[in-house]
């Protein structure tokens, strides 16, 4: 495999049965002051390179594609996830022995992804000809101005995930510019649409006054000469939304693999190629150089 090809990258996180406040606060940098950045970088095992002076460059995209500073929503991410799950009527299975904990066999209810790509490509989109060392957590980058290119890439990626899973199910789209490589964290709820059960009913609409609508029973009760004043309309079945990881991402390992492969292809066709990024491939198939450049 040819190495060092500028590629797009999509990393899908572990399946989630719940979502913690701690994970959400990190994604949105809530409560992250300079001391928190320092403590994060002190963890040598994780090899972090968070730069506090670039915190103000982080941003998120919210409903209708509006770009705002990261953490602008007063409602924390974990609470927004729960709000959407409540709207969908999702109830996790609770552990019988530990009623306050979600059971291990509870369905997955949220999926997190990281969209990124070749370090140099995204660097140029974000910083242009401003030369900075993104791997230096102590450098002063307070003078750096984020370029329009990275906003366009993020907006294109946001539009893509909205088309894929529905804007109402994109709970967070957070772009981090304070680490070594630029990337977007996307937190979603997997939702399928299913037809409501039951018989499909009909209604009768008055030809002269559309506001007059009768049920079949009411229409039949009319004198025969009056029935001709109504037009029959067959009601289509409505759809209901429900949380279903398996129906969205695949019910088998093979189906999930095929879904992920198609996801990479679709993202390349709709977004990646616009920015000179080749189609992403599974992380384990990357060369060592590509693993370094795409994480």
Question: What role is predicted for each listed range?
Answer:
Residues 1-295:
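N-terminal nicking endonuclease/strand-transfer module with a His-rich metal-binding environment
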